[in-house]
């Protein structure tokens, strides 16, 4: 688990956290590390000397990231509202957007970082892509796509669907 946090809650702090989360996502994808990220804003306590972290924002971010069944960055509604308030955009697209987020047993409405648009110049394959194409780089570490269990294959298929929809 990697915890990114700011000492403040200003819009510039939010911008910094979203930039860092997106850069982390980009680096992880380039290194073929499938990650899920959750971003929340709110009460958060930390003690750097003891490496202790706690608070509702940490728990919310954890649940947002871990419940998503894809490679992506899920945010809280408060993060979405603040990103809109700050007019955070990549080109003409909002950085945080409403989306259907795949979860166990279906999907739920929520908010996500529009990383396929932000990282559009880093995505090697032309869109649209399939789940198998998203997975290609990971195969060297995790084996052939066909050997993955259904639930794991679906994560890559959900990721491809989001990439195709958001960057269209």
Can you describe what each PLM-predicted range is?
Residues 1-16, 26-56:
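Catalytic core of nucleotidyl cyclases, primarily class III adenylyl/guanylyl cyclases
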Residues 29-32, 36-37, 58-79:
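Catalytic/regulatory signature loops of cyclic-dinucleotide turnover enzymes
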Residues 2-3, 9, 13, 23, ...:
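Generic detector of bulky aromatic hydrophobic side chains
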Residues 53-55, 60, 83-84:
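Amphipathic alpha-helical "stem/stalk" segments
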Residues 20, 57-60, 134, 155:
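Alpha-helical structural motif
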Residues 70-168:
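Intrinsically disordered, glycine/charged-rich C-terminal tails and inter-domain linkers
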